Amino acid sequence: MVKLAHLLVATFGVLLVLNGCLARQSLGVPPQLGNACNLDNLDVLQPTETIKSEAGRLEYWDHNHPQLRCAGVSVSRLIIEQGGLYLPTFFSSPKIAYVVQGMGISGRVVPGCAETFMDSQPMQGQGQQGQQGQQGQQQQGFRDMHQKVEHVRHGDVIAITAGSAHWIYNTGDQPLVIVCLLDIANYQNQLDRNPRTFRLAGNNPQGGSHQQQQQQQQNMLSGFDPQVLAQALKMQLRLAQELQNQQDNRGNIVRVKGPFQVVRPPLRQQYESEQWRHPRGPPQSPQDNGLEETICSMRTHENIDDPARADVYKPNLGRVTSVNSYTLPILQYIRLSATRGILQGNAMVLPKYNMNANEILYCTQGQARIQVVNDNGQNVLDQQVQKGQLVVIPQGFAYVVQSHGNNFEWISFKTNANAMVSTLAGRTSALRALPLEVITNAFQISLEEARRIKFNTPETTLTHARGGQPQLIEEIVEA
């Protein structure tokens, strides 16, 4: 009887632990790291590995770096040359990306969704491929059908769910540059904290240390018996062997020979459609039935480089634009968000900290000085950040950005669908919200000095970088 009671207690304890783990997963709480984060000294990070392909290259930041490891993310930069095609690829983690330069078209494969894009005219000569007989006759009037294809351009934030294969083609006259972040600590990733790339086509003949794999990386079809592929796809053995790309050394970004013809909407119509989905007036439409956005039709990108969409705009200082689950609903599913900022010369972003997210700040243009302070009040970063570099800003760490002479442009990825910040200076800051008596006693200053601390900075986000120029409180109150 005693043993039975002990067994019941032990079983109950195990159930409590499992219930807690499941609750953390349902809330999106990342699993604990094996080692505590060492964030006493932050660095400005640059790519450490480059993998070249026929029509572009992939550049990786070391995901084992303590800063990226602690944030639970992996960062890469994709460069697709003119006429280059990034072959279909998916990941075990959700992905968010920003188009730094160029334009193109992209498509994603969502399992279970219908092919809603159809060619208006039958393709010719299809009867000569595949097996003979009846199959060839059926293909004489073949019309290509595929899932949704969208235009992407400079300034777009792109969200991709875990397990959804996607491809990108460069339609512009300059390289298409995209910086990408994988949230490998996300609840959707059921594997370890190593970024894993799954290729439906193409290969990586150079291997990849970012995945701790030095051997050549093939596409997923390469591992199957060719005879099994031929049976599954109802094709000849020779064609099944072609799908495995055994002798193909072009990499995962290939050059398209001739015109690239896929069914896609005109560019102008695409962005007019976006304006219809997000009208400036009341969200009512006679065509809106409440079911217009499902997992199959859900938008995957939002342009945040348009000044008209800025959340904070000051003509002589710059602008800041955020995209979260309210502006791009798919972000609620992958639990990521982004912020785009442009800071003009001799301006600064007021000191602030992220309340509920880690931030990965990537410089897209110019340079600026960034200072970061940790939980012990120590300055853990004070460096110039230039184009192509990134900084990891942990949750709760206060930071400030200052541009001197040159403009500074950046994109920040945040590990929360609705990331929140709290400023340390300005009209909506924590200091502004404190009573004067709390400030005077906390810093041992006079009441007048406390009033200056609270009211000398009327801005909320951006201000001039010049210091030591106090403004009269009466002028601020009157303004």
Swiss-Prot record:
Taken from the record, one Pfam family name reads: Cupin_1
- Can you give the residue ranges of the Cupin type-1 domain? 42-241, 302-451
Q: Which residues carry this modification: Phosphothreonine?
A: 116, 415, 440
Q: Is Signal found in the keyword set?
A: yes
Task: Outline the segment boundaries, as ranges, of region: Disordered.
Answer: 117-144, 196-219, 271-291
| CDD domains assigned | cupin_11S_legumin_C (cd02243), cupin_11S_legumin_N (cd02242)
Disulfide bridge map: 37-70, 113-296
GO terms, molecular function:
nutrient reservoir activity
Q: Which GO terms describe its biological process?
A: seed maturation
Instruction: List the PROSITE patterns hit by this protein, alphabetically.
Output: 11S_SEED_STORAGE
- Tell me where the signal peptide lies: 1-23
Keywords attached to this entry? Disulfide bond, Phosphoprotein, Seed storage protein, Signal, Storage protein
User: Sorted alphabetically, which InterPro entries does this protein's record hold?
Assistant: 11S_seedstore_CS, 11S_seedstore_pln, Cupin_1, RmlC-like_jellyroll, RmlC_Cupin_sf, Seed_Storage-Functional
On subunit structure and binding partners, the annotation says: Hexamer; each subunit is composed of an acidic and a basic chain derived from a single precursor and linked by a disulfide bond.
Please describe what this protein does: This is a seed storage protein.
Q: What name goes with this protein?
A: Cruciferin PGCRURSE5
Which species is listed as the source? Answer: Raphanus sativus
The top of its lineage is: Eukaryota, Viridiplantae, Streptophyta, Embryophyta, Tracheophyta
Please name the gene that encodes this protein: CRURS
